[in-house]
């Protein structure tokens, strides 16, 4: 095999024998001596090898011999031989460099003499060439490297300056002419030398770009094995960029889409309490310190948390308490943070020693006490589980070092481990890489020394890492390619589940199969996420053999079987949210888009995200965890302020389907971001009493009504159409229904004013039919076609009245100022012409009490009676004497002994009521009991009306379905026959009430 001709200077200085490196580690060693990029050095070696292979395949031995003869004839044999002698002297092979062969002897010997027999067969071409022919190839390759702008920093390896006084340049020109005339090249009119220079021309300043060019252009020629090595080289380059140019995730928050590879659906079923869970986070040590200050006594353990604090959480509507940092933490982590200047720090909450409750928090006994008292108040405790890694001095690192990803050598020669031993266990030494302490490097490994072995066995264990930023220097990365590790983690999860009904999995996305491989065992060409891991990659088949199924799917199934009634919550990003709940079966998953997009007022993007989810699978929406801050982000008040925008977004948080999660200090308006290593807050902040009162007025009542908003079966999102027909993407309008209770939420997330109509919902997937459907606002809320509806705004606490007919035909007209929001609940249906007068008088305005407004206008209190609120058939006008009697009855005063309704009876709501709602009827002069047979007739009429209504509803459903499916009744026919106008943005001419009532009745009777 031909040797690489490196400069004598490179051999003297760096003891280098070849540009081809058997392992990336060799390239790192040489690069460390040269103070150049190891990735560039390794990439150039691959480029050199690729060009050499192409040269030898394109130019047969006879052609190279003829090329040498051509140079002898055109330039003269003496100048050519002199140039070759100088070249072999300045760029010697190993045998020439060692003095075993002189340059003259080398030029006249057959290359490869003395090679093993199997090598001879493999490299038969090299054996057929004399040294002078091989040196001609090497001369050409040296020229190509010197002319490569991307290889400038590596010039000492092949600097051709010593050849300036020879015929070197003329020989290169002669070779170009010879191969051009011969027609050897990749394209017509291109010489062989032009072809070999193409990668440098295509990507003059990037060796990685040249590798990509070679793969794309000549991959088939070079063969699959060599292409795999080229892809590994690309991965190595990416790793070096990552190592020396690390940055956070940054960038815009992506909008979730669902058009990738098909994924199976396998949701985990919810228990009844799960959709109604409202979670609040508390950094445990910080919270205990704050409680100590508040109550003026030491509160240091979990059992000392006062009952009144749990009462406060219950009264505010919280049903889950996430305690951050309960587990026994790494002592080495605390030492590192204290050495870095945080003298009062504890260890990170995510660098764990073991899954036992920390002793200084009171241990298991204190937890049991708190858990019992919290459960008495309907509050479930939640804890973290950190499956990706353990602390660098954890029990597992001490007792099971083979469970972690490690190497027997440091991956980079520049790493030194001369700092203090961080281990408290005499059996093992733990050493952090020196450059961590002066921030000059972020090592991907730490050193573990086993003092129990005679040779002090040393491992270099990888730190935990998600590939987005620096390694977590107080953690050790578990090796998930090992089945025993996966089982050990699952057993730990089951242990946590037996003690906490809600588990939050930290950084869960790192353990999805594709990300385990991407980060730690990358396929060729897919590496670069974590420095030094490309050389330890696996093919897809190798990886699937090591990890046959998704780890999280196995976890979900095992927990469901062994510890049911446990809610599993995943912190997952990277557009995996839908996959985690729909396919892997997690009950809930983080939705960071909520915080980022509403904060940045990317309203169109967030509305698109909701619409995409509704069109793909609405069930995903109810499994999101929505939040306004989390422990890794700025506080909520820093991001949203403490005014209208904050309360608008908090209202959306409390009323969207999903799990609302409030941050530590969010309600009090605290601005300090608590680090995971904080023992106590560093700022002495006072609670923002105005913000707390605002929550009590606007937010907490909504948390107590989570059952109304938590699910998606009756959730609909609406567009607000402005006067010019455009959709205002800054308005969030949506409704939900639970039983007989209805809720409509409006929020304008922009510093501006807007107005318009809300009528038709966004499309949603009907999973029964597999079709996309829409509903009108009136249909979604189940409103009757006639009469009026009264509802209450839980933001202003005003009551409003609207015409049901208008809501069906036009929708709801709204005007919204900057960051204004409304939550309309307590919907009641009334049917009396005097309510029409109130509706006309108010002209859309709200009042504190509709009962009071009735009394003001008519001098009597309205009477509330229970009435069936299903869609009612419009009553046909009575004729003759019956009509006269009805009119007289309408103006009579109520009986003196009749108890009038109060405001509370009008505005009340009942979660348990089924099919009943408080409604207003016209006051009657006599009770039904005094009317005798007339009461029976009224009852009979009502029964017939209900039956007619059912027939009409069936007809209406058939007609709408026909419109949606494009068959049966046309839109115009629908308007003429049923008069709903649900799907038409443009309303038809209004019909007189009497005509519509006749048509309703006629159509129902015909049906």
Language model features with spans:
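Catalytic domains of carbohydrate-active enzymes, especially glycoside hydrolases
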Residues: 305-330, 337, 495-504
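Terminal connector regions
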Residues: 827-868
